[in-house]
Amino acid sequence: MLHLARKAFWPAPIPFPVLHVDTGHNFPELLAYRDRTVEELGLRLVVARVQDYIDDGRLRERTDGTRNPLQTIPLLDAIEEGGFDGVFGGGRRDEEKARAKERIVSLRDEFGQWDPRNQRPELWNLLNPRHRPGEHVRVFPLSNWTELDVWRYIEREDIALPGLYYAHEREVFLRDGMWLA
């Protein structure tokens, strides 16, 4: 996503801050990569930490240990505090059922909620980001990309990634002479 934003605004710098909702379950190598990239590109980084919300009693640690579902409140607070009326995300429709029905330009109401009845049609490449005061949009430019599209883009653009991305073990299977994940 960051690479696409750089290309979109080149030769000018990216004109908006980069937002990271930190679950506290990130690998140090990834945080170092994030910080190094932000510094190299001269970006302003906004970090909303789930742990801060747990420490303040605004969120409770889950019994299953995952913090992904806890990201919503820190995200909504960061959007409100930053005065953002739009947020870019890297979600893809092939990742899970909930994202499969997400629009590329997804309207959120004044409570940050997604209501399928309020979503606008996406006809051809016509997208409508209009919203009322208090609402915001989330924009998912990679919605129609597959994981393979992402990896091909990374290869084509020669984007450097932390080694951890290549070290993750995944379940794969062979079908019609191709390895699939």
How would you name each of these model-derived features?
Residues M1-A181:
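Nucleotide-activated chemistry modules centered on ATP-dependent adenylation/adenylyltransferase
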